[in-house]
């Protein structure tokens, strides 16, 4: 006995420890852990119902309301059996009520929760429980009131639907029946009525669905069977319709409409089987339906009558039946394309309005029967016209679909041809790099090598075939990025100029462009950084203005088609070692085509792109891109070089200063004292370039170049610019052959990746050398690849410096 007491005491102590652990987990909201502790405690001490009430509280927070109710019921039953404290029982009932309230909010049934709260109050009075009871009763009243209002609304919509149905306005009637269903989805009459509307509208599948719902709600409602059988009969399912009519007979064996439906089904079955049937045949068909002989006799009589009617039917009757079937088919097709054919819907709506107007006139003028008949004939003619119009629309729709498919196919073919042409163009004009070479050069597109990022891709610095290059990786999944890739290759493959960035090659597989690397970044970097801006002397700025002007003139005079840059701004003007400027970023540039209406060249687009502060206002408003668009951007760039200020409102600032005669107040004097004459000439020229009207802007190759060239020559003749001129005469290191140490005339790439003069490397190989002149490593092969891009760059450099000399 003492051993049992010791075991019980030990179990109770262990249960208390489990309760404390569960309470601690509950306070920290570790609800699953709390449930496990309470469960073990309940097993150790079954007489303590607090384990059940505590676990119910955890389940309540976990939204496991059914488990909460189960634990509360068990706690109440065990508490009453053990005569536990009424407070514990009341607490269990209150938590049960809380769970039931949560369930009631979803199921809209507050009665179980109210009963639980009333029982809790009976066990132990609590203000909190009383308040919950009041809230539950108020919620129940709200639900009852809402149900009453919903029922009234449902009755109202059903009555309105009946009115429209009597007026043969079946579409409006179906809409009101639908609203009635939303308010009271358990009324079989509404489903039956809407099924009849669907039948008249030709929506047979929807009518069959509504009839099935009507029967499911009330299997004794005869009209549901009538609607379902009628739909099945119209759909040609005669045997199924016959079985449905037989089910309807169980509701009313003497209903004439059901008997008439049975006769029609029997006639249809007989026609489908190609002959008359006897009473024995009818009993065999209906054998599984357990019908009596009297009903079979009635059906046989109906079939005999149908046979007589069949013999009397004329060819015209058969044609009319076929026409009605065709009309139903057309109506079904119309309903399936309502959303796609709004014009057809409007036309049919007008026809329905005419129907309604004719109906009103018919009700008001009943004595004029002849007139109403004539109007009905006119209406039938209009309906026939609308059907013909509908058929025409269908044929037009099919034609448009075919044209669309042809257009898509042509676009795809053009895209393939364009890609092939682009591939040939890249192969002919530049080196084609592989994706692996690009990934290796950028260290798998490392962020540490990223030197720029734009809307269509990123720019990386890398070493490619032992040359420091700039690699622009465009987004291949972007249409804009692909367009920019094709545009830049197309433009830079056609034009060459000392002040246009050199395209060394491309990787069409990854939409990557490889340019010469210009170490000093962009002109925007210098203008935005105060330290760098001071290194950009006024002589250098004038030289940059002249270089950009000459590059634009070259593009605009390109043959056979002029080129417009379209996005000229300091960020797209790159600077080399000696601050030699080069235009870049030809992604939105365009080749201009001669207009057929006037003697101008332009490019027209519905979606102008570029940098708004530098864009031609007329290009923004009309979408027409011309060389004068670059003139406007050039004027803004000149103003920025003069003032060092941001582009926002820069034109107004300079204009105001010139009107006040205080132009020096806005000039950037941090780079030295500008010659006053140069300032006025450049400011006046820039303001003319930024005129709102294109016609008022000067021509770059005429007046602008004459002024800019004179200012440049005067600026470069100053002593401070002589040193930079000497630096510019030195050729870049990668123009020098590693073997001959002279500027290369015919550069070729060897197997080691280095570029040599063709004659020098061939002589090296012919003398028996099989190693690299640069790395002394064994060459894999002796094949040489012409470096056309480098050769073109060398020729441009030589041409430029021969002209300057």
From Swiss-Prot:
InterPro entries cross-referenced by the UniProt entry: Kinase-like_dom_sf (IPR011009), Prot_kinase_dom (IPR000719), Protein_kinase_ATP_BS (IPR017441), Ser/Thr_kinase_AS (IPR008271), TPR-like_helical_dom_sf (IPR011990), TPR_rpt (IPR019734), U-box_ubiquitin_ligases (IPR051348), Ubox_domain (IPR003613)
Ranges of residues in domain U-box: 730-804
Keywords: ATP-binding, Coiled coil, Kinase, Nucleotide-binding, Repeat, Serine/threonine-protein kinase, TPR repeat, Transferase, Ubl conjugation pathway
Enzyme class: transferase
Residues binding ATP, per UniProt: 451-459, 472
Record keyword Ion transport present: no
Pathway given in the UniProt record: Protein modification; protein ubiquitination
Enzyme Commission number, as recorded: 2.3.2.27, 2.7.11.-
Domain of life, source organism: Eukaryota
Cross-referenced PROSITE patterns: PROTEIN_KINASE_ATP, PROTEIN_KINASE_DOM, PROTEIN_KINASE_ST, TPR, TPR_REGION, U_BOX
Entry coiled-coil feature ranges: 341-417
Family as reported in the entry's similarity comment: Belongs to the protein kinase superfamily. Ser/Thr protein kinase family.
Name listed for the protein in its UniProt record: U-box domain-containing protein 70
